Amino acid sequence: MATSSISAALLSPLTLRNASSSSTKQDFSTLSSLNLRRTLTPTLQSGHTLSNSSNFATFAAPGALEVLETSPDSFEDGSETSKISIAADSDQMAPKQKIRIKLRSYWVPLIEDSCKQIMDAARTTNAKIMGPVPLPTKKRIYCVLKSPHVHKDARFHFEIRTHQRLIDILYPTAQTIDSLMQLDLPAGVDVEVKL
């Protein structure tokens, strides 16, 4: 009996929402509640609902049922405040300051050692570190003729592989920047810093 009452409570707002869906402007909150109703209502492949089935149980969280009991008009009234709160949350999540360090080298052990030095310097100043992220290796292939004049079939193929790493330092302090400036990185590593 409890199963049919839950599915009836889920189906009745769904039919009301479909009847009043002539407006083209829909909010994110109403769409998410509509998707929630669809996921909570069991359906067969033919599209018929299983609300009359006696051996099927539907479970829902209490918070989901409270969302479904509210009327669609209340979603439209509160949509402006929810959009503002989402924008405020995204501003808080994005760091205001970030140092992006991109390292390039032809030799992998050299670039790995440089990454370790940068990460150790940032950790000592309690800065948050993201990385090192290995970027795709760039291969430049050069084709050179073996002979100086003829015999174009005989060639040498040389390649240069450029390995890259990316490190982000979030919320840097002045002490973090000072410790990064004092690092003595090897000469075979190209360092590009963006603030």
UniProtKB/Swiss-Prot annotation:
Keywords linked to the UniProt accession: Chloroplast, Plastid, Ribonucleoprotein, Ribosomal protein, Transit peptide
SUPFAM superfamilies: Ribosomal protein S10
GO BP terms in the entry: translation
Location(s) in or outside the cell: Plastid, Chloroplast
Xref: Pfam families: Ribosomal_S10
InterPro entries for this protein: Ribosomal_uS10, Ribosomal_uS10_CS, Ribosomal_uS10_dom, Ribosomal_uS10_dom_sf
Highest taxon of the lineage: Eukaryota
Feature: transit peptide: 1-59
Keyword presence, Ribonucleoprotein: yes
GO cellular component terms, A-Z: chloroplast; mitochondrion; small ribosomal subunit
GO molecular function terms noted in the UniProt entry: RNA binding; structural constituent of ribosome
Oligomer status and interactors: Component of the chloroplast small ribosomal subunit (SSU). Mature 70S chloroplast ribosomes of higher plants consist of a small (30S) and a large (50S) subunit. The 30S small subunit contains 1 molecule of ribosomal RNA (16S rRNA) and 24 different proteins. The 50S large subunit contains 3 rRNA molecules (23S, 5S and 4.5S rRNA) and 33 different proteins.
Family note: Belongs to the universal ribosomal protein uS10 family.
Note: 2 different forms exist, S10 alpha and S10 beta, possibly due to different transit peptide cleavage.
Function, as annotated: Component of the chloroplast ribosome (chloro-ribosome), a dedicated translation machinery responsible for the synthesis of chloroplast genome-encoded proteins, including proteins of the transcription and translation machinery and components of the photosynthetic apparatus.
This protein's name: Small ribosomal subunit protein uS10c
Organism: Spinacia oleracea (Spinach)
UniProt lineage: Eukaryota, Viridiplantae, Streptophyta, Embryophyta, Tracheophyta
